[in-house]
Amino acid sequence: MNFPVTSRRQTLAGAAAIAATSLLVAEKTASAATGVGGINAIPPLAAQWGELDLAEILSRPAAYMSVSQNKSLYDAGGAQASERHRERGSLPATVKVVNAARKASNFNSFNWIGYEVFRENYPQSDFDRVQYASWTKGLNFTPEMKKQDNDLVGELRALVRPGDNEFNELALQTAFAGTQLPLELARKKIQTIVLTGIHLDWCIEGNARAARDAGYLPIVIGDACACQKPEQEAAAMERINNFFAPVISADRFVELLSKRS
């Protein structure tokens, strides 16, 4: 995949935060206002997925993965707040997915995976070094500010339970390298993986590809994910849906789970 060096981490701070009580309103209006991105970008299922019973697939031993849904992207003052994800609907859709998965007895692995934008202390190649530096160029964050930037956003922090896994991605775009995730999935005999998070065309696609190659059945919740820009989401969802994993909405996920309850 070819991405502009700065496409993942545009670092202009300043998107205004909204109250948690407005989440449901945001879900209905954020994408609808422009008709671009979010739930509007979810394509019809690719023909091959129509051969499967997705409700049955979702009834198998399953894991949930939230990737890079941190304060950096959702909260005012975050290094990536200019992308305005709080206003774009992925957060309430994610809450809907997590609440439904918690009620399903076959979901026995919940993974909250951070992605630090400040990566000066990470192992890095020459490509990594210049790319990581470009994400935070011009920012003057203290160590405490950097830590807070990578904290799980508050609405999702409230959903974390004892026994959940919290760790950071260490590779460029996947949690399947350099983390405990492969061992977690193997020990719990996971078959199906449900993905939400940011960025859709980076870590979500990267993890969906890695999951497929490792023999898992990934399903991407389109409206619980987002690209840097809404207009990038339709192409990303179409690519993922055509080649790597079914892309469905949060509402469809809830509906499919209810068929097996």
Walk through the language-model features, giving the residues of each.
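Short amphipathic alpha-helices and their capping/turn segments at secondary-structure boundaries
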Residues: 48-63, 95-102
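N-terminal secretory signal peptides and thylakoid transit peptides that target proteins
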Residues: 2-18
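Active-site alpha/beta core segments
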Residues: 85-188
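Active-site-proximal loop->helix
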Residues: 228-241
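A charged, well-structured terminal subsegment
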Residues: 247-261
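Short Gly/Thr/Asp-enriched flexible loops that form oxyanion-binding sites at enzyme active sites
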Residues: 204-214
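C-terminal segment of N-terminal export signals and the immediately downstream linker at the start
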Residues: 25-47
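A short glycine-rich beta-strand->turn/loop micro-motif centered on a GG-aromatic cluster
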Residues: 194-198, 216-230
